[in-house]
């Protein structure tokens, strides 16, 4: 659920999710939702597809074909590619986006930047995420009116391995007196915390939620703060 003025939503999931949004007050008024109840690509009036190599020197090439709506779900798929040429390739380049001759993996990253921006309230995502080695699904928001990290970043969900141990994370970042220097507040919960309670955790859908007002940001997974 989203109501975050000057914040846009970025989804880098590798599987399915429906998305809702509510306004901020004690009775929760719905202000926007996307139930992904069409077939094919996402609505261009709401969603953008990131393209190519984007951030963090990651292995995947982002493209629209890997994110489609099917049967009321948004399905985002990571794929292993074979003999696919990187169109940006320049031999001897020092740019990580251009030094790779071949694209080894593709996936999708979709955002609402410039189309849906909100401030305060409740943001809720129902999703099933991949937990295979190498997976890095994420749901996060960025401010839209200045460069990172001064714009702020809220990571409602991330999953990846820390020193070989799978974790689910919730993070917030903001600017410092150094350009590109972020201050982070992070909570990393070992994945085993969830599978000890439910061995079938990975096969089920779960609800990630952010409650945000003028004083505090609270991030939940299945109502657990």
Model regions and ranges:
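Hydrophobic h-region of N-terminal signal peptides that target proteins for export
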Residues: 13-22
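Compositionally biased regions
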Residues: 9, 16, 109-110
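Bacterial N-terminal signal peptides that target proteins for export
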Residues: 1-9
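GH16 jelly-roll
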Residues: 24-225
């Amino acid at each position: 659920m989203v109501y975050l003025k000057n914040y846009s939503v970025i989804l880098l999931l590798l599987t399915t999710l429906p998305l809702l949004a509510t306004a901020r007050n004690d009775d929760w008024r719905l202000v926007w939702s996307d139930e992904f109840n069409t077939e094919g690509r996402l609505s261009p009036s709401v969603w953008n597809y990131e393209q190519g190599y984007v951030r963090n020197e990651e292995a995947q090439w982002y493209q629209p074909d890997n994110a489609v709506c099917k049967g009321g779900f948004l399905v985002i798929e990571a794929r292993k590619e074979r003999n696919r040429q990187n169109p940006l390739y320049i031999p001897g380049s020092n740019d990580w986006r251009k030094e790779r001759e071949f694209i080894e993996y593709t996936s999708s990253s979709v955002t609402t930047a410039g189309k849906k921006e909100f401030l305060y309230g409740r943001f809720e995502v129902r999703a099933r995420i991949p937990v295979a080695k190498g997976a890095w699904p994420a749901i996060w928001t960025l401010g839209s009116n200045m460069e990172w990290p001064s714009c702020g970043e809220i990571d409602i969900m991330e999953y990846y391995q820390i020193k070989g141990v799978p974790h689910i994370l919730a993070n917030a970042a903001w600017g410092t007196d150094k350009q590109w220097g972020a201050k982070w507040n992070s909570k990393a919960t070992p994945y085993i915390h969830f599978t000890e309670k439910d061995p079938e955790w990975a096969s089920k859908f779960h609800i990630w939620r952010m409650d945000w007002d003028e004083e505090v940001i609270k991030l939940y997974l299945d109502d657990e703060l």
